[in-house]
Amino acid sequence: MQPLVKGRYIARLATDPLDVARALSLRHLSFVTHRNLSHNLSDADAFDQHCQHILVEDTKSSTLVCCFRLMHFANRTPITTSYSAQFYNLSRLSAHLGAKAELGRFCIHPDWSDPDILRVAWGALTTIVDGAGVEFLFGCTSFDGVDPSKYQKAFAGVYPIKRRAAK
């Protein structure tokens, strides 16, 4: 993927271990520190070495403002080795024979809120997915807390919520 620029942001692939370390640092800030979890937790996992890491940087300060990773699965390659498969039964998704990719660890720096960050990130994702011929994109997401009512609108968009009849 060629770097993608919009306004003051650039999205590009990580090219070396230092880039991946920067992504891991932002992930730690977003998923551990910002949520007041144990600072000793690392956000690195065994999947990182098998993924493309995409960085979105502010061109004025070189600050890493967003990152995510993609793990590609070629045609007929089972997705049972994906991050998501650790937590969910993906057997029905495995029936899809085309190229697949798992989107993971998507985060935006907690101190940055410019919508162009998301636009550049999704633009880069689209470029990569289209360029690789990916037919099916999947992944996990994290929600703060355990109260699903806070996220009812988001859940309804991907999985219709049926109301139970009053007894």
Where are these regions (language model features)?
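Short amphipathic alpha-helix that is part of the acyltransferase structural core
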Residues: M1-C66
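Acyl-donor binding region in acyl/amide transferases
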Residues: F73-K167
